Amino acid sequence: MSFEKLADIIFGNVEHTTEYYVEKYPKRSLKEGARVTRYAPSPTGFQHIGGVFAALINERLASQSEGVFYLRIEDTDQKREVEGAIEDTIATMHNFGMDFSEGMTGEETSKGEYGPYRQSQRAEIYNTFAKDLLIKGLAYPDFCTPEELAQLRERQIANKITPGYYGEYAKFRNITEEEAIKRIENGEKYIIRLKSPGNPEKRVEFHDLIKGDISFPENNQDVVLIKGDGLPTYHFAHAIDDYLMRTTDVIRGEEWLSSLPIHVQLFEVLGFEAPRYAHIPTIMKQDGGSKRKLSKRKDAEAAVSYYKEVGFPVVTVIEYLLNIVNSTYEEWRAENPKADYHEFEVHLEKMGKSGALFDLVKLNDVSKDRIAAMKATDVYEYYTAWAKEFDAEMYKLVTENETMAKEIFNIDKEGPKPRKDFAKWDEVKDKIFYFFDELFYKESAEQIELPKGVTLEAAKEIVETYKKEFKFDVESQEAWFDDLKEIGIRLGYCANRKEFKANPDQYKGMISDVAGAVRAALTHRTNSPDIYTIMQIIGEENTRNRFDKFLNI
């Protein structure tokens, strides 16, 4: 059934033919094997870590094949649009080292020859293809009200019939052109639906780049193509956009897998060659004895802003996500400790098929490794950039004491086993505060940590003697420790663990207790870098002042 007259009434403002757009957006001139991928978010709120995960896969595959990675904004649901979301998306991706070859560059700006890259600006294109389907009898106007559709669904469920708008349950599927025109002239509201040629008793065989070979029944639902506001549904826009923008690989979350029968059918009905599909496993979280989807409501780490606020270096988040993408990344990193992550090649076929577990403990481990491998000057730059925005007090202290701060960040950096003190920048303050008098002298006596089994009285006795006898200007850490050991032995502490275990009553404790008391006086903590290095950084006068403070508690 042809609807030429009806098509002219509904889409009277359409200026071009489908052939015009197919010619306007020709196949891209790229080398063989180059992939064209996209990140296509809706501007409806904050960036989810799952979005960064998907974008990273798309960007890596395009980049490593010398292809194109573009940004398309899917803003057909304008009621939910959040102001500034597009700029936030662009800034977030840039912050994560992902810049787009083409696409949106701002709220109203873009670059590239395959635009517009904002769906709300592509109505003419969608209407052209909808008009063509209407003329061919592959689409029709549906005048059902929301109330009628709700009642239909209730009846279907009550009678244990597959719910939906299809076949005999599609009231206006076989409407005549004359009736449709009359209803439109009477001012009745309508939408445009696909007249599905599918038979659910037939199956479609399909190869997913991650899931492998899958089979599903043909779609027989008369899905909506154009909504009442004149904008397309996601399904219709996806087929047209990804064909005309010449996307080679649609890489998206597995929540869209159930829509694949509709999308495959739309490509066939429109006469388009379908792209390759890869459905990424959903990011999951361990919650007690079970796994669940990482939730925007329940989990702070679901929001991309969380990683910035707590201070995970961007590169560590990327490297952790690459661990999820391909389990071989961890082995590659161990073999290439100094290599840039861009050198790692992502392979979809090596990706897990089931839910990807997001583990903050593992992320912390990855982050500690990467920060430990950084140069002290880089740690300083990254930390001050973070502190400037999130910790004004520390920003002031480290920038006013830049030389000392870099010395602190360089502790044990050049040895075979660098310290792994920090996983994120919000941990730095608690780990290095004692280097700064402004923070150290704020601490109360109750905050001082003593070695297990060492009383405050015993610790004071050690510090009082050590203050009188220690030598500050010793040539090495080894010489400093020999000095500490001699003082400890004179105080009645054992230097040999085996001897102490054999005769514990003959000693006050171990030399480690002596070192622990000195550490407590200088740092108020039981865990810190070696005491000799701390003393060299804060200086002799400050060292003696801290001993005095401790003795006056």
Swiss-Prot record:
Catalyzes the attachment of glutamate to tRNA(Glu) in a two-step reaction: glutamate is first activated by ATP to form Glu-AMP and then transferred to the acceptor end of tRNA(Glu). PANTHER family: GLUTAMATE--TRNA LIGASE, GLUTAMATE--TRNA LIGASE, MITOCHONDRIAL-RELATED. The keyword Aminoacyl-tRNA synthetase applies. It catalyses: tRNA(Glu) + L-glutamate + ATP = L-glutamyl-tRNA(Glu) + AMP + diphosphate. This is Glutamate--tRNA ligase. It comes from Clostridium beijerinckii (strain ATCC 51743 / NCIMB 8052). Keywords: Aminoacyl-tRNA synthetase, ATP-binding, Cytoplasm, Ligase, Nucleotide-binding, Protein biosynthesis. One of its GO terms (cellular component) is cytosol. GO terms for biological process: glutamyl-tRNA aminoacylation. A motif ('HIGH' region) lies at residues 41-51. It is found in: Cytoplasm.
